[in-house]
Amino acid sequence: MHRRRTAIAVSAALVAAPVLTACGETEHPGAAAVVGGERITVAQLEGRVKEVRAAQRAATPDDTQYQQTIARTSGLARDTLHSLVLDRVLDRAARDAGVSVSRRDVEQMRTNLEQQAGGARALQSIWLEQYGVAPRRIDDNLRTEVQAQKLSAALGADMSTTDGKATFWKAMAQASKELNIDLNPRYGTWDVQKSSRVDAKTPWVKEATVAAAPQPA
């Protein structure tokens, strides 16, 4: 089966040391992230998460199975924010490289994938279960897939090789830097070099837990 975001999903372990950015609630109230000066609000993020949860509920009428699905996708909000930010990074990298994606490009990919999956409903089920993508967002998701493929081609980056991956992620890192990405600390920080969200380190939580633990008599 076709893997979502062929280029985006490759390992970024080959890049240099991370540069992390995060924004505080007081700096950008109500923002889950600020990308290129534009806010992704907490309300927008929560709306996207609700779309996925509603689709999961509709696809899983059994309460026990639905609760298992929720437990399995407990990081949905953070994963969704990562995708929202990464889409914008990819847009910038593609624009820098002169890459564009047409509606026809997306339609052609969707048609091919539906044929492989066994129909439109089957594709929706796969994208929801495997990638946490609500049915109404599939075209947006496929656009990023086409965009990533076109970007790698424009860069002359063979994504099956280490050098090709390095070239691709260098362009993504530059785009991340240009966008000056800030994340609300509750969702982690943004690794500029890897173009990826990472969990914020909160050592004080561990320290507080240890301090609160009962001492032996």
Give the role of each language-model region.
Residues 1-72, 176-217:
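Short, low-structural-confidence N-terminal segments
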Residues 2-4, 120, 140:
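A generic short-segment signal for beta-strand/edge and adjacent turn/coil regions
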Residues 28-131:
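N-terminal targeting/tethering segments
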Residues 69-96, 123-185:
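Solvent-exposed, amphipathic alpha-helical "stalk/arm" or coiled-coil-like segments used as scaffolds
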Residues 106-112, 142, 185-192:
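Short linear loop/turn motifs
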